[in-house]
Amino acid sequence: MATGSIPFVLIHGLVISSLYMIPLAERMAEEHEVHALDLPGFGQSEGPSEVLTIPELAEWVIAWMTAMGIEQCHLVANSLGCEVCAQLAVEAPERVVTLTLIGPTIDPKAHAFGVQVARLLRDSLREPFRLRLNWTFDFFRAGLRRAIGTTRAMFRYYIEQQLPQIAAPTLLMRGENDSTEPQSAALAMTQLLVRGRLVVIAGAPHCVHYTNPREVWEAIQDHVQRHSA
């Protein structure tokens, strides 16, 4: 199967819709089929009344791929979405050709709720105003109960336990100024991957795919081409 025939599936982060994936998706769409999903209960996707766990969100993405007739894809995720995609890559390795984790949460050495919330708030000040406005709108659309419940689900998930089980070649990417995932955490996560590589985008925050879509897309293209034989 040619590289160009394998679609890209983009999964958003915590309490935000897929809208902030558009700058990256637009660059991808010049040559590839691209799908930017809204997870259940976020953005334009209706969700169940209960809050879904990370494994349940991964199952939902797998079911969506099956319904869409997508047998394999290049998975790209940010923040919370990295946990969902890591779980998916372990549960259904045959569906994932390559995996790109942008600003994965959570720092394996800092699972404490207060520590992570403080880091998220600190990073939010480095994000563009338009993105913060987008997040605020999506927060209220998702609702307080789902926002808090999903945040708790993210903190209770230990991505470091899944990383060694991922067979797909994995690109881990972070913005240099991302306070939610220090360089030490990114290096530790990369070392847990069987086929992992780390790329750092200079001067960028947590949502580096939004602020630096060109650099992120170039890194993803290089990653895909390395494993397109």
Residue ranges of predicted features:
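Acidic catalytic loop of the alpha/beta-hydrolase fold
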Residues: N177-E181
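Short beta-strand/loop motif that positions the catalytic acidic residue
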Residues: I166, L172-R174
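Hydrophobic, aromatic-rich cap/lid helix
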Residues: L133-Q161
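Conserved HGGG/HGGXW glycine-rich cap/lid loop of the alpha/beta-hydrolase fold
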Residues: M1-Q44
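Flexible "cap/lid" loop of the alpha/beta hydrolase fold
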Residues: E83-E91, R95-E127
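Catalytic histidine-centered segment of alpha/beta-hydrolase-like enzymes
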Residues: A204-W217
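Catalytic histidine neighborhood in serine/cysteine hydrolases
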Residues: T190-C207
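Conserved acidic catalytic loop of the alpha/beta-hydrolase fold
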Residues: P55-C73
